[in-house]
Curated annotation (Swiss-Prot):
NCBIfam families: PRK02551.1. Transmembrane segments: none annotated. This is Putative NrdI-like protein. Belongs to the NrdI family. InterPro entries: Flavoprotein-like_sf (IPR029039), RNR_NrdI (IPR004465). Pfam families: Flavodoxin_NdrI.
């Protein structure tokens, strides 16, 4: 049994919706897996300590920024910084396959900017992106990437 871990934070419910639908899709399409959702907001809210991951994971990161335009005059990450703290904890960065970014395309250059910044900061790739809650095609696309990373076998 392979454990697929999805580390994320959801503030407006969009990322939670995507990760939940992704989990359901993965379980319906691939055999011999279990999917673990690790919601960083819950760890923080419950006062639990961060811990080292003992197996690989994929991170999901929405974009919450203030100030600047993300290109010419900077920006400041807000609300999602606990994900960065979790990834930076112990050897967690080395266990991260990569990050899936989300956001709103109306923000132009700031769309998925936090995911791009984490990619540079921690040295792992941006695996994919989706807008708002994501569409079924986004779920299928990210599931295919995860299947390749974890070397999963299709159910049928």
């Amino acid at each position: 049994m392979k454990t697929i871990s999805l580390v994320y934070i959801s503030l407006s419910g969009n990322t939670e919706s995507f990760v939940t639908r992704l989990k359901d899709y993965l379980l319906s399409q691939y055999k011999g897996i279990e999917v673990q959702k690790i919601h960083i907001k819950d760890l923080v809210k419950e006062g639990k300590n961060f811990y080292e991951m003992d197996h690989p994971y994929v991170a999901f990161l929405p974009t919450y920024l203030e100030g600047g335009n993300g290109v010419d005059n900077g920006d400041v990450e807000i609300l999602t910084t606990p994900v960065g703290d979790f990834i930076a904890y112990g050897n967690n960065a080395s266990k991260c396959f990569g990050v899936v970014g989300s956001g709103n395309r109306n923000f132009n250059n700031q769309y998925c900017l936090t995911a791009k910044q984490y990619s540079q900061r921690f040295g792992f790739p941006v695996l994919a992106d989706f807008e708002m809650r994501g569409m079924l095609e986004d779920i299928k696309h990210v599931a295919a990437i995860i299947a390749d990373l974890y070397e999963l076998e299709k159910e049928n």
